[in-house]
Amino acid sequence: KAVDMKPSVREKMILQSKCSIRDGYYDASAAYIRKAVDDILARLHTDYLDILLLHRPDALMDPGETAEALERLHEQGKVRYFGVSNYSVMQMELLQKYMKQPLFVNQLQISLAHTPLIDEGMAVNMDIDQSVLRTGGLLPYCQFKEINVQAWSPYQKGFFGGSFIGDLEEYGELNSLIDTLASKY
C-alpha cells in the first residue's frame, strides 16, 4: 500500500488504469470491464478512477455493449473519463458512436526517438517512406476531436529498440540535452 487514500489525499491525484486485455486475448465485454474496474478500485483502495482506458482494441467487441458498460460506470461514479490505447480513427469513431461522453485520451507509442505519428503529417505529398499514411491521420484526428494523446513508452526508440536513455552512441546529443535540462530543473 503506497498511499493512504484519505479523501484529502485522493483529491490531489489523477488515477488512471486500463482494462480489456487478458491472457491470450482482448476482452471489451461489459462483464469483463465491470469486474476489472471493481478489482482495480479494490486494489487501489479508492471509490473511483479519474481515467479508464481500454487497452488495445478488441476487434470482436460489440461497441454498443462496451459503450453501455462505460456509461454505466460513469453514472455509478466509478470512472470520470474514458479513453483508449492504440485505437485507430475508425475504432474510436465506432466506439464513440455509442457513447454519450467524448473519449478523453488515446494512449499511443510516441517518443523523441519514435515519431511516426508526427512524421506522416510532415511528409505529406513527398515521395518518401514517412509520407505513407499508416495511421489514417490519427494525430490530426485526435487534435480535431480534442482527444488527448498520451505517450506510452516515452523513452523507447521503437517497440523492440529499447530505451534511448543512456544510448550515447546513437543518441548522445539527446542524452546530453536531457542531462542538462534535468540538472537545471
Predicted regions and their residues:
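Active-site mouth loops of central-metabolism enzymes
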Residues: 19-34, 55, 60-61, 127
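Active-site phosphate/pyrophosphate- and oxyanion-stabilizing loops and adjacent acidic/basic residues
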Residues: 3-4, 38, 93, 179
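Short, acidic/polar
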Residues: 26-45, 65, 89-94, 134
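N-terminal binding-site loop/beta-alpha segment at the start of enzyme catalytic domains
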Residues: 1-14, 75, 157-158
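Beta/alpha (TIM)-barrel catalytic core signal, keyed to glycine-rich beta->alpha loops juxtaposed to Asp/Glu
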Residues: 57, 61-185
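A short, structured active-site edge motif that brings together acidic residues
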Residues: 10-23, 107-112
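Active-site groove signature of glycoside hydrolases
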Residues: 41-62
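Short acidic capping loops at alpha-helix termini that bridge into adjacent secondary structure
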Residues: 9-13, 47-51, 80-81, 102-105
